[in-house]
Each structure stands twice: as structure tokens, then as C-alpha cells.
Amino acid sequence: MMEKIRLILLSSRPISWVNTAYPFGLAYLLNAGEIDWLFWLGIVFFLIPYNIAMYGINDVFDYESDIRNPRKGGVEGAVLPKSSHSTLLWASAISTIPFLVILFIFGTWMSSLWLTISVLAVIAYSAPKLRFKERPFIDALTSSTHFTSPALIGATITGTSPSAAMWIALGSFFLWGMASQILGAVQDVNADREANLSSIATVIGARGAIRLSVVLYLLAAVLVTTLPNPAWIIGIAILTYVFDAARFWNITDASCEQANRSWKVFLWLNYFVGAVITILLIAIHQI
């Protein structure tokens, strides 16, 4: 049993849990202005069960590609034996359904709409016949929805409407999510082609994809600087993603795996930028 739990948690990418829980918690706190039981319920859901489902479904149906991908098998993606696939799918359902029921019951119609979109995006990204991850450009839009929707749910679940400034911030976050998905796809161009999988990177090539990623990161940084001071500090923090990806501006399909160096930096940049945002918000609140 403990081994099964270990494999399930490994598949859920613990290093990336913060990418979904933090947006929900931050948006909830900014809009509701308080911490209550619903806040903690959402944090727990988007921290672990949500990621078990999102990455678990992906690992099951991407198995043939993952076994050909040298970077899979650690923090960047588990390669679970086929004997564990049914367990992983059951865990995805069992761990999420109770939370979803409560979030639907105690949420608003708007948060329920975003929650429905979020769940559908998680399933559609990897599930057979839908496979949005194999539909170029739709793959980036869907992946970004995985990370932006928790923030939208957090911002609307208490009945308070997001401000214009929050919508701008969410727009910047959505651009960041698209850029990040494209960056991740660059390193997998050859592995995906060998497995006959399509992605935005396999269609426009590694170089085109990395350059698009850089542009989207830059747009995200510019958009957030349109917010009142001191939002420009966050814009500067986002530029670290631009510099990280731009190092591989002239990458080729043959050398696409080199982009993994950028991806490894990206994983830790999330913590750095998250810390900058947190410290900035605390400072503003104290002022």
C-alpha cells in the first residue's frame, strides 16, 4: 500500500504542487480578504488531489512517449509500470470527487463554471479521443487553463467579483502558462515525434517554439507592468523567465533536448518569483 501511495504522489509532481495551490490561495485571499475553512479546502484540493488527477491521467495515456523520453522518471515526470495505471486512475477519481462536490455545493455559479472548465481541461488534455495536448496551440491554451483556473475559482468562489486589476493580472498569468507549456514541449520534440505525438513544438519546430515562448513571457511581463505601482517589480521578476528561455533562441530540432536545462531552471524560478510576489504583497499590506 505504501509503495502505491509513493508512486501516486511521485506521479503528481510534488515540485509543481505550488503552481496550482498558490494561485487559488492568493486569488481567494485578495478577493475575500479572509482565511476560512473553504480557503483551506481549496488549498488542499489544488495542492495534491488536483495534481494527482492532472499528471496521473497524463502519465497513464502518455506512457508510450514517456518510456522513450530520457528526462522522465523523476521530478519531471514519473514513468509508472502499466500494472499501476488502473490504480492511478482510481486515485485520480477518489481523491478529487469529494473535494469537487463540496466546492460545487458551497461555491458560486461563477466559481462552479470555472471549476467545470478546470476539470474538463484536466481530462481533455490527455484522455483518449480528446487529447488536447496533441492539438497544436490548443495544447498551450489548455495547459495554461490548468494553472489559471484555480486562481479564477479562488477569485469567484466567495461571491466577490474580480477587479479590473485582477483580470489584467490573470491575463498575464495566462500568457505565462502558455509560454511555460511551450517551453516544456521544446525539449520533447524528438521524443514526441518518435511516438507519433503532435504538439505546438513538433509543428513549428523547436526554434519557433522557444521564440514564441520568449515572446509570450515578455508579453506577460509587459502586461503586469500596466498595473499600479509597485507591480513593475513583478514584471521584472517575470523577465527571469524571458532570460532563461532566450538562452536557447537558436536551438534546433536536433538539439531540442538542450532546452531541458532551461526547464530545470524554470522549475525553481517558480519558487523565486512566487516569493517575490508574496513579499511584495506583504509589504503593500503593511504599508
UniProtKB/Swiss-Prot annotation:
Subcellular location: Cell membrane
GO molecular function annotations of the record: transferase activity, transferring alkyl or aryl (other than methyl) groups
Gene3D superfamilies from the UniProt entry: UbiA prenyltransferase
Functional note: Catalyzes the elongation of the C(40) carotenoid all-trans-lycopene to the acyclic C(50) carotenoid flavuxanthin during decaprenoxanthin biosynthesis. The enzyme acts at both ends of the substrate, forming the C(50) carotenoid flavuxanthin via the C(45) intermediate nonaflavuxanthin.
Ranges in coiled-coil conformation: none
Main location as per UniProt: membrane
Cellular component annotations (GO), alphabetically ordered: plasma membrane
Alphabetical list of InterPro entries matching this protein: Prenyltransferase_related, UbiA_prenyltransferase, UbiA_sf
Protein family according to the UniProt entry: Belongs to the UbiA prenyltransferase family.
Residues passing through the membrane, by range: 15-35, 37-57, 97-117, 137-157, 166-186, 218-238, 265-285
Protein name per its UniProtKB record: Lycopene elongase/hydratase
Entry membrane topology: Multi-pass membrane protein
Pathway assigned to this chain's UniProt record: Carotenoid biosynthesis
Cytoplasm among keywords: no
UniProt entry keywords in alphabetical sequence: Cell membrane, Membrane, Transferase, Transmembrane, Transmembrane helix
Encoding gene per record: crtEb
Reactions catalysed according to its record: all-trans-lycopene + dimethylallyl diphosphate + A + H2O = nonaflavuxanthin + AH2 + diphosphate; nonaflavuxanthin + dimethylallyl diphosphate + A + H2O = flavuxanthin + AH2 + diphosphate
Loss of function: phenotype: Disruption mutant accumulates lycopene and shows altered carotenoid biosynthesis.
EC number in record: 2.5.1.149
Cross-referenced Pfam families: UbiA
UniProt keyword Protein transport present: no
